[in-house]
Each structure stands twice: as structure tokens, then as C-alpha cells.
A protein has these predicted regions:
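PEST-like low-complexity, intrinsically disordered acidic/proline/serine-rich tracts
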Residues: 1-187, 191
Length: 195
């Protein structure tokens, strides 16, 4: 969704920053979202979030593959799931509940870089709903501020080595409509991981 396969348009006033891999950004807006480089050298706040190892350019959420380090590990215990990305070695610890209705809201004053994730099982699919982003990261790509973003991720095991990953981004302050993306994650062989 949407049916045309295109990202919805930005709403009036939504922030869209350029310069993902260096170069100019729009003004001197902080935090600097470019992956490498920055807008100055006076202090760490002038450098990009990826360069500072705060948020990787493909570490999500949502997980969107890019140049390298696209590995994601999923661990599960009785009460939690852990979604760990190789990029930045970020681990989201996701408490698990019985259903969507049981997900307790976090105080709206608490805002986190990767949001507050909570999950539940919908038959064979792990559903993770993330809210309370800090507004300093983008909603998707370089658009938006994430402050109003609600991200819903669905992880469905297809076979022994494949997970179907689907995500839906809802951010009415940035995009004119919600949108959904999906891709398959396959488990690399132990030999591939050693390379």
C-alpha cells in the first residue's frame, strides 16, 4: 500500500532534508542526519548521526537494506523479543503482550531515538508496534521528524531460513497517507558471516 507502489507525498510543512551521504543539508539543522560527514567540526553535534553511532543508516526502525551490514538477528524468550541489527549493534528489546489491546501506552513525555516498541503474536506473525520516537530522527528516509510516527512491523517465518518482513509507517505530520513495504530476510550461512 499504496496501490501505485509509490511513497505518498509530503504534507505541507513537512521537513525533507538532503545530503544523506554528505554534502549540503538544508541550513544547519541539528541533529545532522547525513550518514557520513557533517556541517562543521566544532563539536560532535556537527557530525552525522551514523558517524556518531547513534542511528545507523539502515538500522531502522524500520529495517531497510542499503549498502552493507544488513544483518538482523531475532531472539525470543517467554516475555520478550530482541531485534538486533549489525549496523550500530542496536538492540530493540520488545516486551510481548497477549494482544494489541493489551499494549500499555508509554507516557507521552518519554521519547526515544528508536521509539518504544511493544509486541504481540497474531497467529504465526510477530507484530511490533513502535511509538514515542524522539522527533530527532526522520520518519522515513530523510523526511519528517518522527515525533508523530507509528511504525507497525510484522515478522512471519516462511521457512527455516526465511522471514517475511513487512512494515507500515503512519505519520500524518509528514506523509499524506500511510505506506507499507515488505521484503524477505534470509539467514546467511555461517560461512557467509565469517567473510
Amino acid at each position: 500500500y499504496p496501490d501505485n507502489g509509490q511513497l505518498p507525498g509530503l504534507v505541507t510543512g513537512a521537513i525533507a532534508r538532503q545530503g544523506v551521504y554528505g554534502g549540503a543539508t538544508t541550513g544547519e539543522i541539528r541533529p545532522v542526519r547525513i550518514a557520513a560527514g557533517g556541517i562543521g567540526t566544532d563539536g560532535p553535534e556537527d557530525r552525522g548521526l551514523s558517524e556518531r553511532c547513534i542511528i545507523g543508516f539502515n538500522a531502522g526502525p524500520p529495517f531497510v537494506p542499503s549498502l552493507y551490514n544488513n544483518n538482523v538477528q531475532i531472539f525470543q524468550s517467554k516475555d520478550t523479543a530482541v531485534l538486533m541489527t549489525e549496523m550500530i549493534h542496536d538492540a530493540r528489546i520488545v516486551p510481548l503482550y497477549e494482544s494489541l489491546d493489551d499494549l500499555p501506552p508509554l507516557n507521552d513525555d518519554v521519547r526515544l531515538w528508536t521509539g518504544d516498541s511493544k509486541g504481540y503474536w497474531d497467529q504465526d506473525t510477530l507484530v511490533v508496534v513502535t511509538r514515542n520516537f524522539n522527533g530527532l530522527s526522520a520518519s522515513f528516509g530523510q523526511a519528517g521528524t518522527s515525533i508523530n510516527k507509528v511504525l507497525t512491523e510484522r515478522f512471519t517465518r516462511v521457512d527455516e531460513v526465511t522471514v517475511d518482513y513487512e512494515f507500515t509507517v503512519e505519520d500524518p505530520a509528514t506523509f499524506s497517507d500511510r505506506f507499507t513495504g515488505c521484503l524477505l530476510y534470509t539467514s546467511p550461512s555461517p560461512r557467509d558471516l565469517r567473510k
